[in-house]
Amino acid sequence: MFYPDLFSTCKQFGNNFINTKIPITMNAVTIDFNSVIKITDEQFYQLCQDNPNVKFERNAKGEIIVMPPTGGETGNRNFEISVDFGIWNRQTKLGVCFDSSTCFKLPNGADRSPDVSWIKQERWDTLTPEQKEKFPPIAPDFVLELMSPTDTLKETQSKLQEYIDNGVRLSWLINRKTRRVEIYRQGQEVEVLQSPIELSGEDVLPGFVLNLQTIWD
C-alpha cells in the first residue's frame, strides 16, 4: 500500500518527492520512478539523508532499491569481518576501509553499498573533499558481500559481477547458508570454494587473511 502512495506523491510533487519519509521494509523492493521523474545524483543523496533509517541503493537503470534491515546473526558477522579488516588496515596503512553504510557511485551510474569495501590510499586521495563527504564516485579496489536470509543468490551474484565490470579488482561473496564462497577477479572466471577455512587478500590486500571460522559457526 505504501509504494503506490509514494508513486502518487512523486507524480504530484515532482522534485519534492525526496521529502517523503520511507518506512522500513523486511524485503528488498525496487521502485522505478523513471516514467515520472529522472532522479538526479543530488536528489538521490538528499533522499538518503532525509531517511537515515532506511538503506537505499540505485541500479544502473536508475531504479531505487529499498534494502531490508540486517538481522542479528548477519549483523554480528558483518561486524566481526569489519573488525578484521580494520585491524589489518590500521597496521598496514595501505588504504581506507568502509562499512555497509557507505554508498559508492559506480562508473555505470549505479549507487551501491557493499557490506565491506576498501580503497587504496593513492586512489582515495584523488577525490575532492566534497566527493569523499557524499557518495564517492569511485569503484573500490575490494568489496565483500555477506548474504543475508533476505538476499537472493542470483541478484547478489549479479551485483558482484557489476562490481568487477566497474573496476573492482577483487570481490568475495560469502554465503553462510551453503558455506560457499565465490571469488570474483578481473579477467578471470569466478572461483567457487566450499567451506574454506580462510581467504587470502592476494595482491589487492597484501598480507590480509580472513578467518572464516567465526562466519561458519
PLM region spans:
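Gly/Pro/Ser/Thr-rich low-complexity, intrinsically disordered segments predominantly at protein N-termini
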Residues: 2-217
